[in-house]
Curated annotation (Swiss-Prot):
Gene designation: arsR
Subunit structure: Binds DNA as a homodimer.
Protein name: Arsenical resistance operon repressor
Keywords: Arsenical resistance, DNA-binding, Plasmid, Repressor, Transcription, Transcription regulation
Domain HTH arsR-type, residue spans: 1-92
InterPro entries noted in UniProt: ArsR-like_HTH, ArsR_HTH, HTH_ArsR_DNA-bd_dom, HTH_MetalResp_TranReg, WH-like_DNA-bd_sf, WH_DNA-bd_sf
Length: 117
């Protein structure tokens, strides 16, 4: 894996959808694709495309569990990048937490949702 550069990080975070993904994962730890689709009100192909970009840059890690793919922030990102993500999260913390609370009651691993797309 290539080393994450500042230019790569800022290019990734300059998109509203990718920034939203990163901030939600910072708040919640790990989410599946369907949770991110619901939280950001975006289609699965669009979210998957953005997740692939974040994964390829080394910002995210994924793991498969049955038919679901779960994503989380990589613990291997440089400390300077983690600090930037943390500052972005702090500036949007209230908004992110509102979305996180809604997701907590309906995420795909919870019992209130029968099918995850």
């Amino acid at each position: 894996m290539l080393q994450l550069t500042p230019l790569q990080l800022f290019k990734n975070l300059s998109d509203e959808t990718r920034l939203g993904i990163v901030l939600l994962l910072r708040e919640m730890g790990e989410l599946c694709v369907c949770d991110l689709c619901m939280a950001l009100d975006q289609s699965q192909p669009k979210i998957s495309r953005h997740l692939a970009m974040l994964r390829e840059s080394g910002i995210l890690l994924d793991r498969k569990q049955g038919k679901w793919v779960h994503y989380r922030l990589s613990p291997h990102i440089p400390s300077w990048a983690a600090q930037i993500i943390e500052q972005a999260w702090l500036s949007q913390q209230d908004d992110v937490q509102v979305i996180a609370r809604k997701l907590a009651s309906v995420n795909c691993s919870g019992s209130s949702k029968a099918v995850c797309i």
